[in-house]
Amino acid sequence: MLKAVILIGGPQKGTRFRPLSLDTPKPLFPLAGRPLIAHHIEACAQLPDIREILIIGYYPQTQMEGFVGDMQALYSSSNINIRYLQEFTALGTAGGMYHFRDQIRAGNPRAFFVLNGDVCADFPLQELCDFHEKRPASALVTIMSTEATRQQSLHYGCLVFDRSSGAVSHYVEKPSSYVSTFINCGVYVCSMDIFTVLAQIFHSRGQEYSCQAFCNGNGNGNGREQGHIKWEQEVLTPLAGTDKLFAMPVPNWWSQLKTAGSAIYANRHYLGLYKKTHPERLANVGIKRGEGDGSLICTVHPDVYVHPSATVHHSAVLGPNVAIGPGVTIGPGVRIRESIVLEQAQILDHTLVLHSIVGRGSTIGAWARVEGTPSDPDPNKPFAKMENPPLFNNEGKLNPSITILGCFVQVPAEKILLNSIVLPHKELSRSFKNEIIL
């Protein structure tokens, strides 16, 4: 038996994903018509030995229970139990696993997967599991690894490993100088003995906590709970060079979802994966899937996802890389490319939407133009990953990026919105360029 753990953090995480995360938890943001971590769950469910998937974070239970209920119903026939375990406070990337160790160990699984909730990938979980089980008995963790450019590697966990055995000899999280172009993908398979290591860290932290609390009178002086454990720095780094940490390099597509701009890039790749795994989800032939009459949607340039409840005028043109959410209305002559349109949005007649995300319940008037600047990886650099630049450059000016409309934004007719970010519930009255509209 196998289990999987998906780590999703909490509300104070994912701030760079605003304004999209202001009304929807980042792990539930839809990519290619499915919530982000639904893709993780789908990958885990492909493994015949998976019996339970645990989502660990500190989002309120009320924000996650609807999604978990939907997933449980979807995979009930596969005999997979899906649960959300809410941390009482932020416990770090490994603290939550240790806190819920009894739930993870219940049923005596032979190993369990750990997936960071903010990564997007074509997850080769079966290959990762097979690789791990062929390692020596001392192996505790196997990391899924990929290559990045020399400069970009500094933004990730870097590892040095033996290419024949996979044994990791050195691991550094976000090094200040070059270590290796092989990086940590945030996907792991762990032996159950890893909890012995976590227990040692927890108890040593307890002694440190007690000492600091005594010296400081009350708190421990750093604002962290005793159970707060950093997976990368406190677990992986010490395991390197002990023949207990291994890595499996993969050529598969992989990306992090850190900023709103990276959502469009991830959306494109998940739509591309559908062609291989779920072609029935795509509207690439211009036919609305799930409709009894098989009526023509509109002109489609693959790959495009259209929710069955969306209304699209036959003269509209969609794609490539477009996802249309539930209840969306798209009027005559509309052109949408490289964009995500969320539920209940309205795109009125002859509007152009390029490299943008249109928030839930937003309306764009007729003959308007909403356009952003793509932030894709450099196609001329092998292994290049998504750049996640800050909002502002060194001169204090807004960096060009995709255009984002928060929920329930009103864009009037015949206006232009270029490289701008609009916070929720704003009613615009003029055109904007390179601005954040508060």
Curated annotation (Swiss-Prot):
Pfam families: GMPPB_C, NTP_transferase. One of its GO terms (cellular component) is cytoplasm. Residues 282-438 are annotated as: Hexapeptide repeat domain. Gene3D superfamilies: Hexapeptide repeat proteins, Spore Coat Polysaccharide Biosynthesis Protein SpsA, Chain A. GO terms for biological process: biosynthetic process; GDP-mannose metabolic process. Signal peptide: none annotated. InterPro entries: GMPPB_C (IPR056729), Mannose-1P_guanyltransferase (IPR050486), NTP_transferase_dom (IPR005835), Nucleotide-diphossugar_trans (IPR029044). GDP-alpha-D-mannose binds at E87, Q256. Residues 373-402 are annotated as: C-loop. GO terms for molecular function: enzyme inhibitor activity; molecular sensor activity. CDD domains: M1P_guanylylT_A_like_N. Residues 2-260 are annotated as: Substrate-binding domain. The N-terminal substrate-binding domain adopts a Rossman-like fold and has a binding pocket for GTP or GDP-alpha-D-mannose. The C-terminal domain consists of a series of tandem hexapeptide repeats that adopt a beta-helix conformation. The beta-helix forms several protein interaction surfaces involved in assembly of the GMPPA-GMPPB mannose-1-phosphate guanylyltransferase complex. A loop extending from the C-terminal domain (C-loop) is involved in interaction with other subunits of the GMPPA-GMPPB complex and may be involved in allosteric inhibition of GMPPB catalytic activity by GMPPA. Component of the GMPPA-GMPPB mannose-1-phosphate guanylyltransferase complex composed of 4 GMPPA subunits and 8 GMPPB subunits; the complex is organized into three layers, a central layer made up of 2 GMPPA dimers sandwiched between two layers each made up of 2 GMPPB dimers. Regulatory subunit of the GMPPA-GMPPB mannose-1-phosphate guanylyltransferase complex; reduces the catalytic activity of GMPPB when part of the complex. Mediates allosteric feedback inhibition of GMPPB catalytic activity upon binding GDP-alpha-D-mannose. Together with GMPPB regulates GDP-alpha-D-mannose levels. Belongs to the transferase hexapeptide repeat family. This is Mannose-1-phosphate guanylyltransferase regulatory subunit alpha. The lineage of its organism: Eukaryota, Metazoa, Ecdysozoa, Arthropoda, Hexapoda.
